[in-house]
Amino acid sequence: MDSLCLNSGLHGVIPAITAVGNGGCGGVVEVRATASAPSQKRGPFGFSFKYPLTPFWSRGGGGGIASRRRSGLCLDDAVLVDSGDSRKPIAEETAVEMDTERRNGSWVLKILDVQSTWKHEEEEDDDEVEDEDGDEDEEVELDDAVVSEDDGGCDVCSVLEDDGNEANKFQLDRESFSKLLRRVTLPESKLYAQLSYLGNLAYSISKIKPANLSKYYGLRFVTSSAEKTESALKAENGEVSGETKPIVEAEEEVEEEEKNKSRKISASAAYEIVASAASYLHSRTNNILPFNSSSKAENSDKHDVNLTNAESSSDVAYSVTSVVAAEEDVKQAVADDLKSTISSPCDWFICDDDQSHTRFVVIQGSESLASWQANLLFEPIEFEGLGAIVHRGIYEAAKGMYEQMLPEVKAHIKTHGTSAKFRFTGHSLGGSLSLLLNLMLLVRGEVPASSLLPVITYGAPFVLCGGDRLLKKLGLPKSHVQAIVMHRDIVPRAFSCNYPYHVAELLKAVNGNFRSHPCLNKQSMLYSPMGELLILQPDETFSPGHELLPSGNGLYLLTSDFESPDIEDSDEERLRAAQTVFLNTPHPLDILSDRSAYGSSGTIQRDHDMNSYLKAVRSVIRKEVNQIRRAKREHRRSLWWPILVARESGSSGIAVSNGQINGQDFSGMMQTGRKSLQRFSRLVASQHMPLIVVMLFPVKLLFLGAFNVFSFR
């Protein structure tokens, strides 16, 4: 999923803009390219704007219209897909062959694909004189919008007052943060492992073998997005003949090759540009980080921005910003394309557990061009007329997938009636889509709340503002949404980290929907966490531990601390503060400023990949199972120990009550006899009779028996 971008100037606006300063609601200050941003209590941010942020970047050479409009550097945390082995289903490792070239595709080049689809929109504005006039008009409109925002109330003041308030109120370190963590039980971990396995399969749906799915997990494969798309295309256009289809595919391959040749930026060069941009911005804003993730941030190297690749980086930056700041008719065209029932922005598949009558809907993350368009159209709109605010691009994509899946939902209810259950899950963008689809089925009356099992997401961005309030309004508990987040995954932090004040003002300037966005105005974030937040920490050999979490791997539920609340509702406030601190530690800018974060072997890929989630959950289960086995072994030894003590006492001439011995023997046999009988039956069945003596009798008991025999002789 998703991207974080910073651009270097306002698209279509002269470098000086009028914005509300920190001196009060009525104050107006002028921000210029040579002036630093007003000092506010805020965190750093990397995100995408069509109108770049001029004060952050200096630019040498050429200052024409084109250079003013396409300046900026893009910071993106896309799902960097690795080669074959990283996404192989565990049960089918030897059978699945991944498409290496597709899986290693650069997220920057994927963004360039998005840019190419929007290029024709800019060709209409080639005349420089008309552009200059339009820029001046737009400047007046934006300035008026910023100034007039204070007429209805002091939203800016509330941003400044509320920003970081809860986090500062509750000082959280590792010790205090650990008190808010509860280890997930073994049955819950096994459920999460099963769903993470299905989420991993979603990236290779064409390779799924229904027989293996049934063998390992007892699930029956039902259908997939590929089958739905094929059926829709046949119904609309008719089936393509066998002779024509290869010709069409060949033409498409030629067009794709030409498109690739037209690109003037390589993945390695793009990573260098992005890392330089993030590092430079990190050095400029390091002193205003509200949640400093580590001491390394204070001692990080300050890299100079290399603007020799400005032409290439501007293509990337512009493609990221072109969607959210485009005209409404253009954005509506993208929305219509996203909710098309013919194609799906993310692949998905459905499988059934016939014993529990549960239908699993599994959705993959960002892979296609359509999914990237959904990511980039991040402006807020209302969700289903219920007052909650939602990410527009993902909401529009969910509408199209809703129409595709609805027949399968109705068919399952028709077959099983009130006993029908639905479990939605997904990774990255797929997790956000799973949540919206689940809620849409309930709101639209297609599925009762009793049939909807909790939604479980992996590394998914939060896409709702007022989500917890919406759950309460629908009569659902917070546990209905369970968001599993890798300890250093950048994607869940993308929309929920703290945004600087001036970035919030720029968002309001380029898109009117942000001006009344409550999360941005009062919490300095785009979309707030909702439901339950579960934190997954893998082994330290795989990824360094998190500074707020206990050492070692584990899966924790972040919950309220109910010990002696200081004030009313302090538990809920403490929980929100803990979520805020965690989602800003490390801050996305800290992650992006590290050059080792990029590429198929970078930390972004490592901490966000679905296969990493699967491996981490399974390692937690192994650790828990080993602890349980160790505890049972110690328990059995404690039950047999009195027998050994009694025999030793008898052999040394010490009198011991027979009733005491018999009672201890009887208690031990009652608690361990069944296990011993099971072991004995397995040994008999395997014809390993010589091992019975070794297995049934402890070593000490054998030595004592032998000693007694020799002593009598």
Curated annotation (Swiss-Prot):
One Pfam family from the record: Lipase_3
InterPro entries: AB_hydrolase_fold, Fungal_lipase-type, PLIP1/2/3
Any GO BP: defense response to insect
Region (Disordered): 118-140, 232-261
GO molecular function, one term: galactolipase activity
CDD domains referenced in this protein's UniProt entry, alphabetically: Lipase_3
Motif GXSXG per record, residues: 426-430
Cellular component annotations (GO), alphabetically ordered: chloroplast; chloroplast membrane; chloroplast stroma
Membrane topology: Peripheral membrane protein
Family, per entry: Belongs to the AB hydrolase superfamily. Lipase family.
Note: Plants overexpressing PLIP3 exhibit stunted growth and accumulate anthocyanin under normal growth conditions.
Protein name, UniProt field: Phospholipase A1 PLIP2, chloroplastic
Organism the protein comes from: Arabidopsis thaliana (Mouse-ear cress)
Gene: PLIP2
